[in-house]
Amino acid sequence: MYRVFTPLAAIAALALVTTSAGAQDKLKIGIVATLSGPPAVLGQQLRNGFQLAVKDLGGKLGGREVEIIVQDDELKPDIAVTKVKALIERDKVDFVVGPVFSNVLQAIFKPVTDAGIILISPNAGTSNFAGKECNANFFVTSYQNDQAFGVAGKYAQDAGLKKVFLIAPNYQAGRDSLAGFKSFFKGEIVDEIFVPLGQLDYSAELSKIATAKPDAIYVFLPGGMGINFVKQFRQAGLADKLVFLSAFTVDESTLPAQQDAALGFFAGANWAPNLDTPQNKKFVAGYEKEFGAVPATYAFQSYDAALLIDGALKLTKGSTADKNALRAALKKANFTSLRGGFKFNTNNYPIQDFYLVKVAKRADGKYQTEIAKKVFSNDADIHAKNCPMK
């Protein structure tokens, strides 16, 4: 566990200011993210996005000085539970923000929400918590997993692709991924493979793809998994033979390592760095200046999580004491999202637009995804109808 002293010195200085007599205590935010191993780049983006938002808001959220406590969940659900309990019981955090991976979300969901603490996920958005297991203490600033994954399925169907090969990790988000794709694609699934979470060698899977000769592949392999798969896919000579469709396999967190190997590959997303909103332009420029890298969805969604908290606390005058009032304030989504339009559905998941994006190389040599076309407008996930909240 470490407190947020780097890389943003400005936040640290602001967060350590002693409050004046009679002022509210510091707002404590616990961030839970994967910050070690091959997927660490995803957690770093999540952490960085939230920190940048706090800096841009003058070191305060809803008028209160902020203390951010960051925990590395190590992509281990049991470790995540131990650390989140420490955030709640020892550190007395007001909010928990995270995690990256859905298996970690499944583990920490009950300990956080049962404690009456608001859990805001800036990435993981599983189908079960969008439906029957929805919870008033759980808010999502990303998406319900199926939605982002459905973009590629819709594109494959509309493009007239006949045969697709599917690959994803064997955990909840992986299963949601393939379900989301198949909900829109009605052609032939020539094969469907679930690999162990964290797998880095794909020689066996690439051999099967070459033998199957599909029109396209659909891949959900985030972080280091995607970095290795894309490089090996290109090296195997398959990139010129079939369409590469994906979700969170080629994005700004992985492109610095994938580089030209990912050029021209497609993904489904709710955002891209070139999304034309004034807020987004400022965010992308600020993130690149602060961290020397192009922000990914993990960063933008956690930036929005900070804006969500700030907007809610402005409505409650900085107070988190009345949980009903706090939840109602969060539900109003009193902020301007980097993606533009944003509102919560009854299950506290966003209703938003989704895009097909394509990997491009910028004039300055950096890589990013760029919007190819809008696929869904004001899209609400299909599981909300099963959520008892209204």
Model-inferred region functions:
Residues 1-9:
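Bacterial N-terminal signal peptides that target proteins for export
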Residues 16-23:
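Sec/Tat signal peptide C-region and signal peptidase I cleavage site
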Residues 26, 41-46, 56, 60-129, ...:
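Beta-alpha junction/loop-to-helix N-cap segments that form part of ligand/metal-binding clefts
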Residues 27, 331-390:
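Solvent-exposed, acidic/polar segments of extracytosolic/periplasmic ligand-binding ectodomains
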Residues 30-51, 71-78, 100-101, 167-175, ...:
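Extracytoplasmic "Venus flytrap"
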Residues 31, 87, 91-100, 120-122, ...:
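Periplasmic-binding protein-like
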Residues 82, 127-130, 135-236, 271-282:
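Extracellular/periplasmic Venus flytrap/periplasmic-binding protein
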Residues 230-303, 314-320, 363, 369-389:
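Extracellular/periplasmic periplasmic-binding protein-like sensory domains
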